[in-house]
Amino acid sequence: MAKTMQLEIVSAEAAIFSGKVEMIVVTGGMGELGIYPGHRQLLTSLKPGQIKAILEGGKEEVFYMSGGMLEVQPEIVTILADTALRAVDLDEAAAISAKEEAERRLAKQKAGIEYSKAMTELAEAAAQLRAIQMLRKSAKKH
């Protein structure tokens, strides 16, 4: 039996996931992080991206988050996300539309607050699409 740790994923709206996992992969401020049971304590920011959790027994679950914070303690990992959704709940058409709209706005703006907002929206839409793609790859494996 593989070692596990408790994972809690919480957004401003609701608790998204609570359970035992064998491994977690998230997008940190400095790149991807792989967290296994026994990982050293850590507190870091998270960028928009996906959360991949390998559940007890090896099943994979994918989530989307718009950014937030990650806290790793000896027995528990907590992800406090601005927004978090299970990848199966994402709307691919809406994500593609949001990405295209953000790209159009970026083409018009060269600097300023609107440019920064469009960049953030583009990153979030791209992260949603990556989470959907990751979910599809996972489904093909099983």
UniProtKB/Swiss-Prot annotation:
Subunit field text: F-type ATPases have 2 components, CF(1) - the catalytic core - and CF(0) - the membrane proton channel. CF(1) has five subunits: alpha(3), beta(3), gamma(1), delta(1), epsilon(1). CF(0) has three main subunits: a, b and c.
Alphabetical keyword list: ATP synthesis, Cell inner membrane, Cell membrane, CF(1), Hydrogen ion transport, Ion transport, Membrane, Transport
Keyword Signal among UniProt keywords: no
InterPro entries attached to this UniProt entry: ATP_F1_dsu/esu_C_sf, ATP_synth_F1_dsu/esu, ATP_synth_F1_dsu/esu_N, ATP_synth_F1_esu_C, ATPsynth_dsu/esu_N
GO cellular component: plasma membrane; proton-transporting ATP synthase complex
Stated role: Produces ATP from ADP in the presence of a proton gradient across the membrane.
Protein name (record): ATP synthase epsilon chain
Organism: Coxiella burnetii (strain RSA 493 / Nine Mile phase I)
GO-annotated biological processes: proton motive force-driven ATP synthesis
GO MF terms held by the record: ATP binding; proton-transporting ATP synthase activity, rotational mechanism
Gene name in the database record: atpC
Secreted is among the record's keywords: no
Subcellular location as annotated: Cell inner membrane
Major subcellular site: membrane
SUPFAM superfamilies in UniProt: Epsilon subunit of F1F0-ATP synthase C-terminal domain, Epsilon subunit of F1F0-ATP synthase N-terminal domain
Signal peptide: none
Family stated for the protein in its record: Belongs to the ATPase epsilon chain family.
Topology class, membrane: Peripheral membrane protein
